[in-house]
């Protein structure tokens, strides 16, 4: 018996296939296109083919994310919020998880969980690009570096530059000025990571960090941001092997639990 989760985000679409034990069999990630229904279907197809399965082998599909409702109308059986799915995925992988930090392409959120894994409180930033993947993407283009290389590059910084602007537009101008003044890109990048950490750290303070702290979302792949955030909040942060797919994975776990609750193996 197999289950699927599909997370259609504003930037990337993710899909996961798991078995009845919750084991991840396959996953797929692709850039979200204008036709979200098509992107979701194609990502789901790539995923079940990777697992050596057919669409009819998937017992239940749960959708989530920015395009969750679109997936629901196109091919999914049910839709759950990102808050619920990221919490479920993080708790499944890290049973002692009490705080989830999700930094995606267009928003960031912090979720507090009780001992049972239920959401006790959450806050999110979805009105400003600062503290999101989009912020780092813009800065990477200005600096002429690859987005995926920013993390490891920042670790080489010896003289970190402080970025005072929290607004993406103003920070963009600030970075250009810093480059013109001769500051090294590596030091600017380290400063940018601190700026993201301060922004997200403000959300963490509203919820209250409690161990274990788990980070999800594509930005979690950036070791520079993770280290800066650990310093900002004063807690060790656990990073899943594939942090970008945790929402989809959590959705798949929910699909499994819903079906097996009705018809246990």
Regions found by a protein language model. Give the residues of each.
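Gly/Thr-rich phosphate-binding beta-strand-loop-beta motif of the actin/hexokinase/Hsp70
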Residues: 1-21, 97-117
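Short glycine-rich, Thr/Ser-proximal phosphate-binding strand/loop in the N-terminal lobe
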Residues: 5-38, 42, 46, 119-122, ...
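Short beta-strand-loop/turn "lid" adjacent to the catalytic site in phosphate-handling enzymes
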Residues: 28-33, 50-83, 120
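Glycine-rich phosphate-binding loop plus the immediately following alpha-helix
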Residues: 35-36, 116-159, 253
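Conserved phosphate-binding/catalytic loops in two-lobed NTP-binding clefts
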Residues: 79-83, 230-249
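Glycine-rich phosphate-binding/hydrolytic loop that grips phosphoryl groups
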Residues: 133-137, 240-265
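Adenine-nucleotide phosphate-binding core of ATP-dependent small-molecule kinases
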Residues: 171-204, 244
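Glycine-rich phosphate-binding loops at beta-strand->alpha-helix junctions
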Residues: 204-232, 243-247
């Amino acid at each position: 018996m197999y289950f699927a989760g599909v997370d259609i985000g504003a930037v990337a679409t993710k899909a996961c296939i798991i078995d009845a034990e919750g084991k991840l069999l396959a996953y797929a990630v692709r850039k979200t296109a204008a036709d979200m229904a098509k992107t979701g279907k194609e990502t789901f197809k790539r995923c079940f083919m990777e697992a050596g399965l057919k669409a009819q082998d998937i017992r239940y599909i749960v959708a989530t994310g920015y395009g969750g409702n679109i997936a629901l109308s196109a091919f999914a059986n049910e839709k759950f919020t990102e808050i619920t799915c990221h919490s479920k995925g993080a708790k499944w992988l890290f049973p002692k998880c009490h705080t989830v930090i999700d930094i995606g392409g267009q928003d960031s959120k912090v979720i507090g969980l009780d001992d049972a894994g239920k959401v006790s409180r959450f806050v999110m930033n979805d009105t400003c690009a600062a503290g999101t993947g989009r912020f780092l993407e813009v800065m990477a283009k200005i600096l002429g570096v690859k987005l995926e290389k920013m993390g490891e590059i920042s670790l080489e910084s010896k003289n970190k530059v402080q970025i005072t602007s929290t607004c993406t537009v103003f920070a963009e101008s600030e970075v250009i000025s810093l480059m013109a003044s001769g500051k090294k890109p590596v030091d600017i990048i380290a400063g940018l990571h601190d700026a993201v950490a301060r922004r997200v750290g403000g959300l963490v303070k509203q919820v209250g960090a409690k161990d274990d702290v788990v980070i999800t979302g594509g930005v979690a792949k950036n070791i520079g941001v993770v280290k800066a955030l650990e310093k900002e909040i004063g807690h060790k942060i656990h990073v899943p092997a594939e942090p970008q797919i945790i929402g989809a994975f959590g959705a798949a776990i929910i699909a499994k639990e819903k079906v097996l609750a009705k018809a246990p193996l």
